[in-house]
């Protein structure tokens, strides 16, 4: 599904990705952690083929059917919700597919709404609908819940898990939140200085509980891999 070997990317004289070997199977949910500047978004953009491949080298195989969700929903403000979802879709059933996707994310009846009439969480639901209506084989998500409040994040986590279980795309989620990574992912990667330093499989049943000893253990392993002092205050224990 996704395969990279010795993938390298850089900007000018600066090398950002230093030989990434990565495999993601269909239906597998992978989370990517790393400190700011470690190359997380660069790797995601490479997998989305949104970057200039001329700035790098290595093997890159990704499916042609892929979708990207960003922290900013990137909805067109002058287009209604349904029109945002089906933008670029062809076929007589495009509108019906768009309505079905909106129903999947809990926004049935909001097809005629303008983006400005939606909350931040609702806008991200539209962004998910826009991605999944295309039935992507690969879903790339770059901190999609970073700007949402805590309660909305919890709801969006549950929604994303449900949608991925139904549609079974390969998923790469870029996040700064270690708990989010352990909660959602089958595997968690840590990117450090442009290299994959950690690849941790999360062997926990779903739904996962933050209080479970196995959850806490995985969290501590990842925080240590990120170089976080486990004795530090709670607010410092994130992939800054």
From Swiss-Prot:
Record localization: Cell membrane
GO cellular component assignments: plasma membrane
Protein name as it appears in the record: Aliphatic sulfonates import ATP-binding protein SsuB 2
Domain ABC transporter: 2-218
First-level EC class: translocase
EC number, UniProt record: 7.6.2.14
Organism of provenance: Nocardia farcinica (strain IFM 10152)
Family the entry assigns: Belongs to the ABC transporter superfamily. Aliphatic sulfonates importer (TC 3.A.1.17.2) family.
